[in-house]
Amino acid sequence: MPNPIVHFEIPADDVTRAQTFYQNVFGWKIKQMPMPAGGLEYYGVTTRKDGEAGINGGLMKRNMPGQPFANYVAVKSIDDFLGKVTANGGSVIMPRQEIAPGMGSIAVFKDTEENMMGLYQPSKQEMKKAPAKKAKKAKKAKKRR
């Protein structure tokens, strides 16, 4: 599939309480991450070990009443996909913005059913790393045979 879901975000009224809940229920590792853009208090959520199926995400203070759980879809160009969103009846909630230097960009939209979804565009640095990671995985798989 060309555009997989690659990240989730869980908003919480009480981040410490939510952190304890998800760690105790699922055994997820949750730790605070520095976020230079906007000073947002953000926690990385690791749900799997490297090489295992699944996605990781984030936990943060709810910044608006009713803020829902959000999934982020990986795309090559946020601007292109926001154009597709609006052309097909969706609306842009948050235009493209950089997460932090070297971390890529995100945007948020609502679909025709008022569901909120996010878009994630890797940074140029991350795009350069991707082929190297694929080559490394292929080499490991070849050694196992």
PLM region descriptions:
Residues G89, T112-E113:
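Residue-level recognition of short loop/turn positions
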Residues P2, E9-A53, A100-M103:
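Core segments of cupin and vicinal oxygen chelate
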Residues M1-T20, P68-N71, Q121-R145:
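N-terminal beta-strand motif that seeds the catalytic metal site of vicinal oxygen chelate
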